[in-house]
Amino acid sequence: MTDLAQDLAAHAANFSAHGVERSVRDHLALDLVDGLAAIVGGTRAPGIPELAQVLSAHARPGTAQRFASSERYPAVVAAQLNATAGHALDYDDTLDEGGGMHAGALVHSAALAVADELGGVRGETYVAAVAVGLDIAVRLALAPTRDFGWHRTSAFGIFGVVGAVGRLYGLSQAEFVNAFGIAYSQASGNRQCIADGALSKRLQAGFAARDGITAVQLARAGVTGASRVFEGADGFFPLYQRGEYTREVITSGLGQQLLSRRISLKPYPCGRNLHGLLDATARARRAHEGRDPERIDVFISEKSFERAALGWPEHVVAAQFSIPFAVALSTATGRTSLADFDAPDRVSTDVKALFARVHVQPRRGGPDAEDRIVFRYAGGGDHEEITAGPRLGHPENPVSREHTADKLRDCNAFAGAPLSDERIDSLLSAALGVADLQSTSALTSLLRR
């Protein structure tokens, strides 16, 4: 049996640009708008100016655009800056079933940076490259049968970057194998930074974008990497997953079905694990408009409860993953804005008062039971919501094109409006029609301030 690296390399090298179905193209266009929104919105997020200062101190000028700025860098630097910004707000796309991997911001950032460095590529070429890259990332992220604390966005997503960027550079199958092997030497990222509320979580996406491009460039120059990348004795899955993965998830339909369509777009700027509860909160608020609950009981799985941060969030990363904060914010105000998560201490006294009345506890019923939330009102009339069904933004419960466009506008406003309203409208048109562009330069030029 050949290593999965051979299968993925053959897929990446040989997939026809005409094999991207319209539903996949349409989803990728929305994913691109969504990713650009997150990048533009994150340009001033904590850690991003500091990263830019460090990188600019030793980076030469280049031809790849750093978005929402006047700066151009070599592709590896622009991709790192854009991908890090795109992950900073925890507002980028996600894979609900694959450990919460956020692949879009880093794959789009890397592919657009390389396209810039190549002088622009045709839209259909770009779409096929990103579709293959995201397909590879999704397949790898879905394969584990047990979680070992990896941040799959970076540790798994780097191989998606290789798939997309390698296609733009025209790698052969053999060169793809080497690129995957070199990427494996750099694949990393953990969730401890999430538990500790560290800014390094956002950096990990940028590292993967940068290192994926570097792996492809080295393979293209003739440098070799491990050939038994994924299934050798010390390969990715034996070492990183202790052999606990399902191979068929990766190989089934490979080359015939693109799984990028399974990626969800996030309607709320916080951890995806909170979104089902926020959907439920929105429904309850509509049903009881104007009523202030005396108490809110949230029942979640024991595993989630063990990881839950229940105290008042002191900073943005903690706020993005705080169940009591998100539920109180949505219930009290009917919104979940970037500004509120960015500065939790500045929220209204109503939110702070309601926060103290949110009680999170482990639910009964085993792993197959649904999370639920109970709103208890004065004088009775409790209202219970179960978080069953796909969360808003999932392909089976999609957000609208209008919602995604509004997200781009909101993110631009949050970042201090680095792009004019007219520029945003033009950017929306270019991104939604990316497959028909004569050159991706027509899109990235709109992101230059």
Residue ranges of predicted features:
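Hydrophobic face of alpha-helices
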Residues: R25, A29, V33, V107, ...
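Well-ordered alpha-helical scaffold segments within catalytic/enzyme domains
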Residues: G42, A111-L118, V162-Y169, A215-A219, ...
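Hydrophobic alpha-helical hairpins/lids featuring a short glycine-rich hinge
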Residues: A83-L140
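Short connector loops/turns at beta-strand edges and beta->alpha or beta->beta junctions
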Residues: G86, L106-H108, A113, D135, ...
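Generic structural signal for well-ordered, non-membrane alpha-helices
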Residues: Q6, A10, D34, S109, ...
